[in-house]
From Swiss-Prot:
It comes from the Eukaryota. The lineage of its organism: Eukaryota, Metazoa, Chordata, Craniata, Vertebrata. Residues 1-101, 118-154 are annotated as: Disordered. One of its GO terms (molecular function) is sequence-specific double-stranded DNA binding. It comes from Rattus norvegicus (Rat). Residues 174-233 bind DNA. The gene is Hoxa5. PANTHER family: HOMEOBOX PROTEIN HOX, HOMEOBOX PROTEIN HOX-A5. Its main location: nucleus. Sequence-specific transcription factor which is part of a developmental regulatory system that provides cells with specific positional identities on the anterior-posterior axis. Also binds to its own promoter. Binds specifically to the motif 5'-CYYNATTA[TG]Y-3'. Residues 1-11 have a biased composition (Polar residues). This is Homeobox protein Hox-A5. The keyword DNA-binding applies.
């Protein structure tokens, strides 16, 4: 369908050469915005518009667009099988080719939808099969008793202090293990106790760094040594 006259539109927008060529002295191909216009166009717009309109009217409508939309876009309610579709006998070769093309496209769409539905059915079946082993595995895991770690419940706090080093570890952790001093540490502590019965905090820090002991160990050793010294007196 043609919306409007092509020749009038072409004459309205393409007529520009006659007035401007006389006014400016050279060929001007722009748009003429003046009121008066000549009938002749610079580009032969009338002939081009007439030939275009004649070609548009002479060209027959393509069969693909002349067919109803339901034949190409949507399948019929009860489609025939692919082997039973045949072209119309009264149509020409071109029209018959287009018809067979449209029918084959409709058939392929139907077959494709059938194939997609079958694939969806297979997918749902496989998903159900996958869900079934997963649920069975979960049920088996719930039925089986979970094995408890064998070594964790048997470890108690009093068992962890059997292998504590006796030289450089001190401080209370519940019931503290007995500290065993080396001969060098005992000798140095006895020397210090011989000169000073009581230690200042600064001297206690120095002895602790020198003997690789803690301040609490030094303090307790001096307390015990003073109690023994008072008892022996």
């Amino acid at each position: 369908h043609n919306y409007g006259d092509h020749s009038s539109v072409s004459e309205q927008f393409r007529d520009s050469a006659s007035m401007h060529s006389g006014r400016y002295g050279y060929g001007y191909n722009g748009m003429d915005l003046s009121v008066g216009r000549s009938g002749s166009g610079h580009f032969g717009s009338g002939e081009x518009x007439r030939s275009y309109x004649a070609g548009a009217s002479a060209a027959p409508a393509e069969p693909r667009y002349s067919q109803p939309a339901t034949s190409t876009h949507s399948p019929p309610p009860d489609p025939l099988p692919c082997s039973a579709v045949a072209p119309l006998p009264g149509s020409d070769t071109h029209h018959g080719g287009k018809n067979s093309l449209g029918n084959s496209s409709g058939c392929s769409a139907n077959c494709g939808s059938t194939h997609i539905s079958s694939r969806e059915g297979v997918g749902t079946a496989s998903a159900a099969e996958e869900d079934a082993p997963a649920s069975s595995e979960q049920a088996g895991a719930q039925s089986e008793p979970s094995p408890a770690p064998p070594a964790q419940p048997q470890i108690y706090p009093w068992m962890r202090k059997l292998h504590i080093s006796h030289d450089n570890i001190g401080g209370p952790e519940g019931k503290r293990a007995r500290t065993c001093y080396t001969r060098y540490q005992t000798l140095e502590l006895e020397k210090e106790f011989h000169f000073n019965r009581y230690l200042t905090r600064r001297r206690r820090i120095e002895i602790a760094h020198a003997l690789c002991l803690s301040e609490r160990q030094i303090k307790i050793w001096f307390q015990n040594r003073r109690m023994k010294w008072k008892k022996d007196k």
